[in-house]
């Protein structure tokens, strides 16, 4: 039976984390006994970590990573690596802010044998027009830099074969801040069998997003240099339909 590692980063999510864990934990029902929910919480200054520790008594397959970088991207990388090292067959990543809907997971799971990666597509977003615009710009840049066409590169709703993630994860430094964007790009660039499926993306359920517009601009500016470096490496290796 296929094992699933459901992974999510968390940072100062005391208002959301208990509800999110309770909503997503049932996804593990019917999966291999080795399946786990893993939350990376490092750097939180509120009660997120203590709430997670309390939840572990209620949910025995819940595990906590507390020794990662506090930033979102490095946490995602650490979670992917943890799942791979512990023998996951599939990795599903989402966020801990309550914006995604667990009811939409099963449709992804049912397609798992046909694709190396199934990625959420946020056709409508509840987190504002600015973020939707940024995502469109990102997808445009990926087309320019890597000649890939993707409708949503960064959606925190993705089911991937762990063995495929393991092929590309070493290409990113442990502290890289946009791993999901590049993971989507790698899958598309190297011709992995992928599918995008529309998902619901609600407004943040509580709390404050730790990444504001100013940070987004700074991250985006740095990303241009990162994309150039990745493209140079990808062309040099001579692989993929777009090389």
Question: What kind of feature is each model-predicted range?
Answer:
Residues 1-3, 171-243:
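Hydrophobic helical membrane-anchoring modules
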Residues 38, 49-86:
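Conserved donor nucleotide-binding strand/loop of the catalytic core
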Residues 13-28:
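Short, well-formed alpha-helical segments that are part of the catalytic scaffolds
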Residues 41-50, 98:
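A conserved acidic beta->alpha catalytic loop
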Residues 2-4, 25-38, 47, 60-62:
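Short loop->beta transition adjacent to catalytic acidic/histidine clusters or analogous donor-positioning motifs
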Residues 88-99:
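Short beta-strand-to-loop acidic/aromatic patch adjacent to the donor-nucleotide binding site
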Residues 67-82, 90, 102-177, 204-214, ...:
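Acceptor/aglycone-binding surface of glycosyltransferases and processive sugar-polymer synthases
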């Amino acid at each position: 039976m296929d094992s699933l590692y459901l992974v999510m980063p968390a940072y100062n999510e005391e208002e959301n984390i208990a509800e999110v864990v309770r909503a997503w934990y049932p996804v593990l029902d019917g999966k291999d006994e080795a399946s786990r929910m893993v939350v990376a919480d490092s750097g939180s200054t509120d009660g997120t970590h203590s709430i997670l520790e309390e939840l572990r008594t209620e949910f025995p397959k819940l595990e906590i990573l507390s020794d990662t970088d506090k930033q979102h991207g490095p946490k995602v990388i650490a979670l992917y690596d943890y799942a791979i090292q512990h023998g996951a067959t599939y990795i599903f990543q989402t966020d801990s802010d309550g914006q995604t809907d667990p009811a939409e997971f099963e449709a992804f799971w049912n397609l798992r044998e046909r694709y190396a990666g199934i990625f959420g597509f946020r056709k409508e977003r509840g987190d504002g027009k600015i973020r939707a615009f940024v995502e469109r710009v990102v997808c445009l840049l990926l087309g320019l830099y890597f000649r890939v066409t993707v409708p949503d590169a960064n959606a925190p709703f993705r089911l991937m074969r762990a063995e495929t993630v393991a092929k590309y994860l070493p290409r990113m430094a442990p502290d890289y801040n946009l791993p999901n964007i590049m993971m989507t790009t790698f899958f598309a660039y190297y011709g992995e069998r992928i599918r995008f499926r529309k998902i619901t993306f609600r407004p943040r359920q509580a709390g404050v997003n730790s990444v504001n517009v100013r940070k987004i601009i700074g991250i985006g500016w740095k990303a241009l240099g990162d994309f150039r470096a990745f493209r140079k490496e990808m062309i040099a290796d001579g692989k993929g339909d777009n090389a």
